[in-house]
């Protein structure tokens, strides 16, 4: 595993932050030089909260790249979709700043895990969707899903749009932390999505994030 990977989810609050942190920790344990990035963080003032969570999970302090804001180039105060948060803060989202920051990280680290805001179709600006940015940068995607009710539908919709945009799915992370309380729903979701992944993206990896937080 080497290069820049975009971590997205089938929905908001699906466990992207924990999954990103755990994947980074696993790569560190394998001896990889790895960093995480949150290009757009909303609902914060000075520090991207998700980056702080990543570092805690990884077991490392805030890095020089964090202090330089390369890992958190755009922070908005209102907890909303990036396009709305930027508007409410009275300024635009600087895509060039984001691209440059990611490129600088990629030059310093073997692996860069870029955690997106929400799902693939979240608007970054009034005209640009998250998936447009992913396509433009040719990032492979790590998609986080779960066993909660509705996850099959949301995951398959994500599969459709990834195929439509010609984006490579590197892996599907099944997050047990957000499993349905109904064990039948959770297990069926796992079985169904595992089969669909093999059929739709045979080259993609299947990963599971246990309730303990281990990948």
UniProtKB/Swiss-Prot annotation:
Functional pathway: Cofactor biosynthesis; biotin biosynthesis; biotin from 7,8-diaminononanoate: step 1/2
EC identifiers of the protein: 6.3.3.3
A GO MF term: dethiobiotin synthase activity
GO CC terms: cytosol
Top EC class of this enzyme: ligase
Named cofactor requirement(s): Mg(2+)
Transmembrane segments: none
Main location: cytoplasm
Amino acids binding ATP: 13-18, 50, 115-118, 175-176
Compartments where found: Cytoplasm
UniProt: Mg(2+) binding residues: 17, 50, 115
Reactions catalysed: (7R,8S)-7,8-diammoniononanoate + CO2 + ATP = (4R,5S)-dethiobiotin + ADP + phosphate + 3 H(+)
The family this protein is said to belong to: Belongs to the dethiobiotin synthetase family.
Protein name in UniProt: ATP-dependent dethiobiotin synthetase BioD
Annotated source species: Neisseria gonorrhoeae (strain ATCC 700825 / FA 1090)
